[in-house]
């Protein structure tokens, strides 16, 4: 006898200030990810533009705005450009480890430095270690933390300079949240490198896509995602190739915006 399928219940948040476009309001639809079919539900929702935050899947459903567009990199067709190849060579000595979704004091310390430098007034600015543990460890799906470290010395692990909370889905990997060292001049472009390394990892694993969350038209800090081509965007007719206007040369590297409450892990 097969288990009875239960259709998920969806809810809508109350409108609030948009963290990406001044003067706009945001609203989200969300559902709980729980039970034996949580991973399958997350996969299905991910293909129609939902993102995961702990045990919840959500997507924007704003009344008067459709600027948030789901985007994903076609991993097996991606070819790094000259500046991206330079970053790959520069950071080729980093030790990369795929870790279980358990938090460490070292990860939290790096997160605090990252938020102080990049998002001092954001919703995560007051996050404590318990909040961080909830963000990483409360997951009903296959997830892990990818760590990026300086080379080991005398048999001891090197300094942690980057990390990314990453979900593995049936058709790709979803980068939930990344953070990295921002004040080390010898390690420029770490955020970009982390994305490049995830694209390589997906392609080598036979996974077609790397989900980058939302590209937000009109938000300057979200434009870096268009540097990773070929890129697809989700519209009412499905996924289509997407090329945004050219961007300035890459600087210190990309990073995912800091979340505050439900729905800002995009």
Swiss-Prot record:
Domain of life: Bacteria
Signal peptide: none
EC number in record: 2.3.2.29
Major localisation: cytoplasm
CC annotations in GO: cytoplasm
GO BP term, pick one: ubiquitin-dependent protein catabolic process via the N-end rule pathway
Enzyme class: transferase
Keywords: Acyltransferase, Cytoplasm, Transferase
Catalytic activity entry: N-terminal L-glutamyl-[protein] + L-leucyl-tRNA(Leu) = N-terminal L-leucyl-L-glutamyl-[protein] + tRNA(Leu) + H(+); N-terminal L-aspartyl-[protein] + L-leucyl-tRNA(Leu) = N-terminal L-leucyl-L-aspartyl-[protein] + tRNA(Leu) + H(+)
Localization terms from the record: Cytoplasm
SUPFAM superfamilies in UniProt: Acyl-CoA N-acyltransferases (Nat)
Keyword Acyltransferase: yes
Family: Belongs to the R-transferase family. Bpt subfamily.
Stored PANTHER family: ARGININE-TRNA-PROTEIN TRANSFERASE 1, ARGINYL-TRNA--PROTEIN TRANSFERASE 1
NCBIfam families reported for this sequence: PRK01305.1-4, PRK01305.2-3
Free-text function comment from the UniProt entry: Functions in the N-end rule pathway of protein degradation where it conjugates Leu from its aminoacyl-tRNA to the N-termini of proteins containing an N-terminal aspartate or glutamate.
Name of the protein described by the UniProt record: Aspartate/glutamate leucyltransferase
Source species: Rhizorhabdus wittichii (strain DSM 6014 / CCUG 31198 / JCM 15750 / NBRC 105917 / EY 4224 / RW1) (Sphingomonas wittichii)
UniProt gene name: bpt
């Amino acid at each position: 006898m097969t288990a009875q399928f239960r259709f998920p219940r969806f809810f809508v948040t109350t409108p609030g200030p948009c963290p990406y476009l001044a003067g706009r309001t945001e609203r989200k639809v969300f559902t709980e990810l729980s039970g034996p079919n949580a991973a399958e539900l997350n996969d299905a929702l991910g293909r129609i533009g939902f993102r995961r935050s702990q045990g919840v899947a959500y997507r924007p459903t704003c009344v008067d705005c459709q600027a948030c567009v789901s985007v994903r990199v076609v991993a097996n067709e991606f070819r790094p450009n000259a500046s991206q190849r330079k970053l790959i060579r520069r950071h080729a000595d980093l030790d990369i480890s795929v870790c279980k979704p358990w938090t460490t004091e070292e990860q939290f310390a790096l997160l605090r430095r990252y938020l102080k430098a990049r998002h001092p007034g954001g919703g995560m600015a007051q996050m404590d270690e318990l909040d961080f543990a909830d963000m990483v460890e409360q997951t009903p799906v296959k997830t892990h933390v990818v760590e990026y470290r300086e080379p080991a010395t005398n048999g001891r692990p090197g300094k942690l300079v980057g990390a990314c909370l990453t979900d593995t889905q049936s058709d790709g990997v979803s980068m939930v949240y990344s953070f990295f060292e921002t004040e080390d001049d010898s390690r420029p472009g770490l955020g970009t490198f982390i994305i490049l390394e995830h694209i390589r990892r997906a392609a080598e694993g036979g996974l077609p896509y790397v989900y980058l969350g939302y590209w937000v038209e009109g938000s300057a800090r979200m434009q870096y995602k268009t540097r990773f081509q070929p890129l697809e965007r989700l519209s009412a007719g499905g996924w289509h190739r997407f090329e945004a206007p050219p961007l300035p040369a890459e600087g210190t590297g990309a990073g995912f915006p800091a979340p505050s409450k439900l729905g800002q892990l995009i």
